[in-house]
Design a protein with these regions (language model features):
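Glycoside hydrolase catalytic-domain context in secreted enzymes
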Residues: 1-524
């Protein structure tokens, strides 16, 4: 699999495709695409690449285009962890069906989702991409996402191939640090880590991504035990396995391969059928076959698996993207409903909520004017400028003499306010891949605002636009009411305002444990 080329390397990519050296294109640049700016998807460009593959390459085999469509495409829905808080698999499935339609309309055949890593450590940045700490809930989310992506059929227009990732144990990395070692017993593998993958496979997932990490000292991407014994033998998977970004080359750093040729042999023999981006298979595979490190039977097996996936997607019959009308307005309403279902009312002392619409509200905190922060990580194609902020959403709710004053840093002495609403937000770049943190609480800046707000002596409501659960000791007791709205997507501001003023009943429940202190971790 090749990466989408930057402008100066486009001719090189096209020539590789023309020579038949590329079977798939990653529609982004860099391993941490969720936290780095990405170029606009161009249907004409990807149809151009497809035309080269189909009409000019020796084999005439169509390309498979893959992109990280994690929790939305043009329309950004709540992060997967927030969707899990809704405990409504049918609603999740419906959202992903809409997501698939938008992505397919932009040439995407294959999404690198769902992430099925069981995670019990909120310091890990990628906790936001999964279904939480419970294997049963994770399995329900897995099935819902795969079924949503598939729609009426994998080969139908508007569908996207799902990729269950990361097999296996990536979320168990020590200390919540990305890419690090994991110690997992067979008991834990079978009872905690396999159920979500089993559910995804039974729901029809045709691709699986291997994990970066090692388990008990063995890198997963070189593990025949994991990728053939567990995945294909125990779980019955018969589709295609793709490596994570650069994971084959990384086997050198893992200390099990001396060079790319050895890494290619280890990975292909273990069961990885497609090498993502690092070209170890392309550059060294032929030599490894000549040297007897890889058999032609193994090569043919991997090729058949890749071709079966392309055939299942219908690429041989319909290789080009034909754009269709998409009801983006309806999708935004779906995103709003999911954000409403996902929000969790953690506290409501004295039945402070709902607020009156004729109330005098002092709104504080930078979360009130945030836009991109509401999307969270892995929102590659959402337009944050079109996302309403929380200040606007709150203002729209007031009537009958009610008014809202926004003072970001709480420097006001508005003693006539009926309530103070503090909007807190987490930087999305502190979540996602390679974005782990040790301090899972609010910042010193936010604590200073909290002290000023409390000094006003008014009822205090906290609205948290966060990705991960945070340590609540020294925070929760300062608030009279707390609404955890998560990184809830492009309509979460309206959803949170709906809940605060009683137009929507808060129904979300926590899919992960909120620790009092980070020292309690892991806690589940």
């Amino acid at each position: 699999q090749a990466e989408t080329a930057t402008e100066e390397h486009r001719a090189e990519l096209e020539e590789r495709i023309r020579r038949g050296e590329v079977g798939s294109v990653l529609m982004s640049v860099g391993a941490t695409a969720g936290n780095t700016p990405q170029g606009e998807i161009g249907v004409d460009y990807y149809n151009h690449l497809q035309r080269i593959a189909v009409e000019e390459s020796p084999q005439g085999i169509p390309l498979l285009f893959g992109r990280d469509v994690i929790h939305g495409h043009r329309t950004v829905y709540p992060i997967p962890l927030a969707m899990a808080a809704a405990f409504d698999p049918a609603a999740v499935r419906d959202c992903y069906r809409e997501i698939a339609g938008e992505a397919a309309n932009d040439s995407v055949h294959w999404s690198f989702a769902p992430m099925l890593d069981l995670s019990r450590d909120p310091r890990w940045g990628r906790i936001i991409e999964g279904g939480g700490e419970d294997p049963y809930v994770g399995a329900q989310m897995a099935r819902a996402v795969v079924e949503g992506f598939r729609g009426d059929g994998t080969d139908r227009a508007g569908s996207v191939l799902a990729c269950a990732k990361h097999f296996v144990g990536y979320g168990a990395a020590e200390g919540g640090r990305d890419y690090t070692h994991a110690e997992i017993s067979d008991y834990a593998l079978y009872n905690f880590y396999f159920p979500a993958f089993r559910a995804a496979i039974r729901a029809g997932a045709k691709t699986v991504m291997s994990a970066f990490n090692d388990i008990n000292g063995e890198p997963v991407s070189a593990s025949e035990t994991c990728l053939t014994g567990h995945l294909r033998g125990h779980l019955g998977f018969d589709g295609m396995v793709v490596s994570d970004y650069g994971a084959v080359h990384q086997l050198i750093r893992n200390g099990v391969a001396e060079d790319d040729r050895a890494a290619a042999a280890l990975a292909l023999n273990a069961g990885i059928d497609m090498d993502m981006v690092d070209f170890c298979y392309l550059d060294e595979g032929e030599a490894a076959v000549r040297e007897g490190r890889i058999s032609m039977e193994t090569v043919d097996r991997a090729v058949r698996r890749v071709l079966r996936v392309k055939a299942a997607k219908g690429l041989f019959a319909h290789p080009y993207c034909e754009r269709r009308p998409v009801d983006y307005a309806a999708h935004r309403m779906s995103a709003r409903r999911m954000a409403e279902k996902s929000a969790v009312l953690l506290k409501n002392s004295g039945r402070l909520l709902p607020l009156r619409k004729d109330a005098k509200i002092l709104l504080i905190g930078r979360g009130a004017e945030a836009r991109a922060e509401l999307h969270g990580s892995w929102a590659l194609d959402g337009d944050a400028s079109a996302t309403p902020d929380f200040c606007l959403a709150m203002q729209e709710k007031l009537s009958g003499g009610g008014f809202l004053r926004y003072d970001r840093d709480c420097e006001s002495t508005l003693t006539g306010a009926d309530a103070v609403v503090f909007a807190l937000c987490e930087d999305p770049y502190s979540t996602g891949e390679n974005a782990c943190i040790s301090d899972i609480t609010i910042s010193d800046y936010e604590r200073s605002i909290l002290r000023r707000a409390k000094a006003l002596g008014k009822p205090l409501v906290g609205v948290f636009f966060y990705g991960r659960p945070i340590a609540m000791q020294g925070i929760a007791e300062w608030f009279d009411a707390i609404l955890y709205a998560w990184h809830g997507g492009c309509e979460v501001a309206h959803a949170a305002a709906d809940i605060l003023f009683g137009d929507v009943n808060p129904s979300g429940r926590t899919p992960v444990t909120f620790p009092r202190l980070a020292t309690h971790l892991p806690l589940y």
